[in-house]
UniProtKB/Swiss-Prot annotation:
Domain of life the protein comes from: Archaea
Descriptive protein name: Pyridoxal 5'-phosphate synthase subunit PdxT
Recorded family membership: Belongs to the glutaminase PdxT/SNO family.
Pathway: Cofactor biosynthesis; pyridoxal 5'-phosphate biosynthesis
Designated gene of the protein: pdxT
Source organism per UniProt: Methanoregula boonei (strain DSM 21154 / JCM 14090 / 6A8)
HAMAP family: PdxT
């Protein structure tokens, strides 16, 4: 089991650490590396890809520049997308500067929670997640304003939808890799059969 982390911008090392820990908790060892993905060749052999937070217009440009747009769209593994990654996964982002992947049929509102200084943490309830509420870190996060075509809503706040999944993909408006709670990483891996 190899997990790739899109390493163009954002909290790459935090995702690597979280997925490494989640794989170990699920019984995988060094034979299951978590690697940085910077070009299409890096995706070879990956069963999953994390698209971290960062700045969605910048990540979008870098995905195009590095020739990753089509390989990610065609990727057969699961995608775990956080914050800006959630924006890239949507079909409708409302910003022509973002070349979204369109892998989840949903509309997002970029930076719905405001500016950087308005970032916050909150305990949210995630549908089907055992162990009580999930402590979520929101940093200029998006919200999903409309989920369509089988996109399952997992969590909401008063601003809107903040967690969704469909099939092998999960998209979150917050940063689970920053809080130390691996339950969403583990759920994602379990959904992939790991």
């Amino acid at each position: 089991m190899k997990v790739g982390v899109l390493a163009l911008q954002g909290d790459v090392s935090e995702h690597i650490d979280a997925f490494t820990a989640a794989l170990r908790k699920r019984g995988y060892t060094e034979d299951s590396p978590v690697i940085e993905v910077r070009n299409p060749e890096d995706l070879a052999g990956c069963a999953a890809l994390a698209i971290p937070g960062g700045e969605s217009t910048t990540i979008s440009r870098l995905v195009d520049k590095n020739g990753l747009y089509k390989p990610i769209r065609d990727f057969k593994g699961g995608i775990f997308a956080t914050c800006a990654g959630m924006i890239l996964m949507a079909t409708d982002v409302g910003d022509p500067r973002v070349h979204s992947l369109g892998l989840l049929d949903m509309t997002v509102d970029r930076n719905a929670f405001g500016r950087q200084r308005e970032s916050f943490e909150a305990d949210i309830r995630v549908q089907g997640l055992d162990g009580g509420s999930f402590h979520a870190v929101f940093i200029r996060g998006p919200v999903v304003t409309e989920a369509r075509d089988g996109v399952v809503v997992l969590a909401r706040t008063d601003k809107g939808i903040v967690a969704v999944e469909k099939g092998r993909h999960m998209a979150l408006a917050f940063h689970p890799e920053l809080g130390g709670d691996l339950r969403l990483h583990e759920r994602f891996l379990k959904n992939l059969g790991v």
